[in-house]
């Protein structure tokens, strides 16, 4: 048995190596993986494995009751986390039942789907956070690492079970078997009910209830939305022939960042709700002085959205379901030079017109006392400021549930707040946001960064083997009104896209959407990053209903005669400081900036060499407008097609958005250089 398992593991490693080699030989954006390059071996299917191993007879019976054995008998790429019979004995005892006979067919279906994932994962590919593919019950499995009772380094799942060391990574014809020590369970409760059951966060939860914000956290799904109403859409972007579908569901989600009772007591001496209210007053009376003497400020009016405690709690919550700790920042740091800049994402909070900054620490130069690899909220550590921010904990105690049907919560090692420090220092920077982060629905509905970014899809693919592209029917996205097709293109690490993915408009499009809030009033540049292509078109941009400059022509690159022409220099690192300053100032005066110097793409599918965006004429940023912005008002961008030369196949790319205060963009007027990252 052991020898057979070792041979299977060898075959899996060989298959992985050969796949990697085949990827390395592919070039060009349109190349498809050649099936002849893949190593395949004959052996038992997953269904046969289960039937041939009596120690999994209970799970085998569960799968048969769920009528899923045929699936495991067919070709595919699955991971099966099969619980042992001993695990089921403990599960039955926990539920107060005797055997599988006491389970309903629906129970069996849920259990089977919870332990099956439609992708192959070796233990070496399971990083802390969650698996990047949901299980067949559409829930994400939490991953952590620890030692088993024999001091073997093993993978833990949902903090309660671990993969059995002596049986891990056992390959079968259609996937990998990863036997586990316990039956995996997922909560079917809403987020407030999950939080209520954890006594370690009782004070924050009491504040959630007292402010009435708890009632906002029960939304789950729009049952009036029906994906079948929307047909598949075929389109061509440059040379890539693709399809997009409407999202399967329209779900709502929430993510809370919660200081435990012990954190509040240890750091601030807070042990009751009134003390927490006083702390909130200390913070928010300074941020919102106009409300400090209002009736809304009183302790008797905690449900008023202007109340300090209400603001305090609201700022700790996002109106999106961030599926795991590793999803708080760009997944796998895709397309980011992590030695130069920390991967960062910004998300709006439930406190109106505010955002939180999430950062994975990777640049050692500015680590300070923080831990490299960890994720922090509202951190700014550079030559001018040393604000460490609040650390997000990877997990919670195994006796408590962290994820709910409509979201999850994370422990944090301090409070977070939209304080004067956050507003005036942390947020006083170039705020860069991948367009997929602006719309919460993309994260909540498992759309953002889905799929495998290293593979190219066949022309007009409908299998979604490597991931899916989506389009959003008008009304699906909050604060968005759209004619034409608004598409999310899944990540490809060899496309000219920041963080690998992009959003595109097709057809006779006309879209209006709310942009993220700025932290304070003043003059702001609104920039957009994109890739120029000859197949793209022309659009007029509006800010708050007013047209901004001449129409934007996406067929023009930086070396066009109207911009830099022959003065373009690709290798900006060879320039002197004076030359670089002049280059940046010249571009700025024409309304452009080079692409992100901290972003890159691979040179072809499966490539190993890379190209930095700032060195290319086709990947750059354009200034959409320079405007005075009120932080307490909603602001909107409108993009309307004005090109007819490409008919209804007219295309407009939205890669990333930048909100830049005058304190940043104005430095070039004084002969300085804005950092190019």
Where are the regions a protein language model picked out?
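Sec-dependent bacterial lipoprotein signal peptides
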Residues: 1-27
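Mature, structured domains of secreted/extracytosolic soluble proteins
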Residues: 12, 28-677
């Amino acid at each position: 048995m052991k020898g057979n398992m070792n041979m299977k593991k060898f075959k899996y490693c060989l298959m992985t190596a050969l796949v990697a080699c085949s990827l390395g030989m592919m070039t060009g954006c349109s190349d498809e993986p050649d099936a002849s390059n893949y190593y395949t071996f004959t052996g038992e299917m997953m269904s046969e494995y289960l039937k041939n191993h009596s120690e999994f007879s209970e799970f085998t019976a569960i799968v048969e009751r769920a009528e899923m054995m045929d699936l495991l008998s067919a070709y595919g790429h699955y991971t099966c986390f099969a619980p042992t019979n001993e695990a089921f004995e403990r599960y039955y005892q926990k539920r107060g039942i005797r055997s599988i006979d006491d389970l309903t067919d629906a129970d069996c279906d849920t259990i089977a789907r919870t332990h099956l994932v439609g992708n192959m994962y070796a233990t070496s590919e399971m990083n802390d956070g969650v698996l990047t593919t949901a299980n067949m019950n559409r829930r994400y499995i939490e991953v952590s690492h620890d030692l088993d009772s024999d001091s073997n380094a093993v993978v833990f799942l949902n903090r309660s079970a671990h993969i059995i060391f002596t049986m891990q990574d056992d390959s079968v014809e259609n996937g990998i078997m990863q036997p586990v020590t316990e039956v995996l369970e997922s909560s079917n409760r809403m987020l407030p009910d999950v939080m209520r059951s954890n006594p370690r966060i009782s004070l924050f939860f009491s504040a959630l209830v007292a402010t009435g914000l708890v009632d906002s956290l029960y939304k789950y799904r729009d049952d009036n939305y029906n994906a079948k109403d929307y047909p598949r859409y075929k389109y061509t972007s440059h040379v890539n022939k693709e399809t997009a579908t409407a999202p399967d569901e329209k779900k709502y989600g929430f993510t809370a960042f919660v200081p435990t009772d012990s954190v509040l007591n240890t750091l601030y001496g807070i042990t009751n709700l009134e003390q927490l209210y006083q702390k909130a007053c200390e913070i928010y009376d300074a941020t919102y002085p106009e409300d400090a003497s209002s009736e809304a400020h009183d302790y008797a009016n905690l449900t008023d959205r202007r109340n300090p405690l209400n603001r305090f709690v609201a700022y700790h919550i996002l109106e999106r379901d961030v599926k795991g700790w590793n999803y708080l920042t760009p997944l796998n740091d895709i397309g980011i030079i992590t030695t130069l800049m920390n991967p960062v994402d910004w998300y709006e909070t439930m406190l109106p017109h505010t955002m939180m900054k999430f950062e994975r620490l990777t640049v050692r130069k500015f680590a300070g006392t923080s831990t490299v690899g960890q994720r922090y909220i509202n951190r700014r550590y550079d030559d001018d400021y040393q604000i460490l921010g609040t650390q997000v904990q990877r997990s919670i105690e195994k006796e408590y549930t962290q994820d709910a049907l409509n979201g999850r919560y994370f422990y944090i090692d301090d409070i977070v707040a939209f304080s004067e420090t956050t507003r005036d220092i942390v947020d006083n920077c170039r705020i860069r946001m991948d367009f997929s982060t602006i719309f919460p629905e993309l994260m909540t509905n498992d759309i953002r960064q889905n799929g495998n970014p290293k593979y190219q899809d066949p022309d007009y693919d409908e299998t979604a083997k490597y991931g899916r592209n989506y389009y959003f029917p008008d009304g699906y996205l909050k604060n968005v009104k759209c004619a034409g097709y608004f598409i999310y293109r899944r990540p490809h690490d060899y496309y000219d896209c920041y963080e690998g993915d992009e959003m595109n408009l097709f057809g006779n499009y006309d879209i209006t959407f709310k942009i993220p809030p700025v932290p304070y009033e003043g003059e702001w540049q609104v920039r957009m990053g994109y890739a120029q292509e000859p197949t793209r078109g022309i659009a007029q941009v509006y800010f708050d209903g007013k047209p901004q400059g001449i129409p934007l022509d996406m067929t023009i690159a930086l070396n066009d005669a109207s911009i830099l022409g022959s003065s373009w220099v690709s290798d900006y690192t060879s320039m002197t400081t004076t030359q670089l300053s002049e280059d940046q100032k010249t571009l700025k005066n024409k309304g452009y900036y080079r692409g992100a110097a901290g972003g890159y793409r691979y040179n072809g599918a499966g490539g190993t060499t890379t190209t930095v965006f700032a060195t290319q004429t086709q990947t750059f940023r354009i200034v959409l407008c320079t405007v005075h912005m009120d932080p307490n008002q909603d602001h909107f961008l409108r993009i309307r097609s004005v090109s007819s030369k490409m008919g209804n196949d007219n295309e407009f790319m939205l890669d990333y958005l930048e909100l830049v205060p005058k304190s940043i963009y104005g430095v070039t007027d004084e002969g300085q250089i804005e950092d190019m990252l």
